[in-house]
Amino acid sequence: MKRVTLAIIVFTFVALAAALPAAAQPGAPPCGIAGTWIGQVGDTPLMATYANVVGVVAGTSNLDLYGDPTLGSPYFSAATRNTSGRGVWTRVDRRTYDYMFVAVGLAADNSVLYQLKVWGTKTLGPHCGTMEVTATLDIFAPWQNPLGDEPPAYGSIPGLSGTAKRMPF
């Protein structure tokens, strides 16, 4: 009978420990960025999904951008939409990640007007449910390689920031 009681007690403790969020456990692994996040950077609302590719140290991202495709500039007044952003992220420390993604600004006829390279850092909050974001927006001409060494033909917008919340399970 003692063994059965002991087994029930041990099982109960294991079940309770498994139910606790990882961030609440002492010595727990760092927060992970994988999941879906909703937020805003600057004036642009966004929804982002991050997937782990190399364990929890690097992965891919897919971002839907809901902002003004003209970027507030008369130079891009023909822009009617942006593509989704596609990119990568890598862990810097327990709660901080570097990221970069590329999106394209399109006219009504689907011609490319500009390419965006957005890069910065994401820092997760203490309970892994919020994220502080910094961003620099580089605006490249359609003929440029946004991953190359050439400076962006249309300039950069540094110092953007925002927040996001993790979509709960």
Task: Pin down the residues of each PLM region.
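Acidic, glycine-rich flexible loop segments
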Residues: 97-138
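N-terminal glycine/threonine-rich, aromatic-flanked beta-hairpin/loop signature
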Residues: 45-96, 104-107, 130
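Boundary at the C-terminal end of the N-terminal hydrophobic targeting segment
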Residues: 17-26
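Bacterial N-terminal signal peptides that target proteins for export
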Residues: 1-8
